[in-house]
Amino acid sequence: MSLIDVNSSSPSIDRLSPVLDHFRVQATLFHAGPLCGHQRFDAQPGRGFLHVLRRGEMELLYRDGAKLARTHLAEPTLLLFPRAVHHEFINPPVDGSDFTCATLDFDGGVRNPIVQSLPDVIVLPLGAIDGLQGALDLLFAESDQLRCGSRLLANRLFEVVLIQVLRWIIDHPDTAQVSPGMMRGLSDPRLAKALMAVHAAPDAEWTLERMAERAGMSRSAFAAAFKTATGSTPAAYSLDWKLNVATSLLRAGRPVKQVALELGFADAPTFSRAFRRRNGVSPREWLGARGETA
């Protein structure tokens, strides 16, 4: 069985890889060691943070609407900020707390479907995620010592840790307070089959009947469950996914006409109209704003 065999009845289908193939995340280690006193991390558009509190305790403050929410951390904890959120650490002034930290740059920024589904912050005791400790041990070993390739390897290990966290989120959407969206849809075994089919073949025409058949549900039951989980209709979701993949291909340097054909649009003008309706600009204008050409 292949990793993306969406027709299989096995519950162990890989729900993340097709998404991460199109929307990669790049982690960059920027701190390993003690943090003392009051530390501020300003919101940076399109950028998230992943912090691992290894030892010590501290107060976490983060922007929650118009106010600063406050949480006391007293055990080894992982902190995931998937989007630009101002946050602060208040540590003991001398001994501090021991941290390993990375920035996260998600392809697509705020339109990344993973980012769109997650809350502003996820706070997890390290022991909550089965199998995480092995990756953390490797991460700490590389971040604690300056050896050839250590920084590059630490960056990749942070990405491994993030994927393990995303796995946990899919399996525990209520605990993670996941909003309606792709991640909550993937947490439902039946809906996941339809979503994976859409993710694996964005060029196909995904009708309600076809998606419901993949999920093994009636059209009415599927449409209702899909709307509740993702906050979108099946038709709107499949088009949005197609256009998200289009931006990924455009960023990779594919010509507009080629993107249109690869994703099943009748022609480049049809693709451009759909792109403009969703993004407010044409693909060429979007590329121009990024300093690129079509």
Question: Whereabouts are the PLM-identified features?
Answer:
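N-terminal intrinsically disordered/low-complexity leader segments
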Residues: 1-12, 174-182, 291-294
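Short helix-to-turn junction characteristic of helix-turn-helix DNA-binding domains
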Residues: 53, 198-201, 246-253
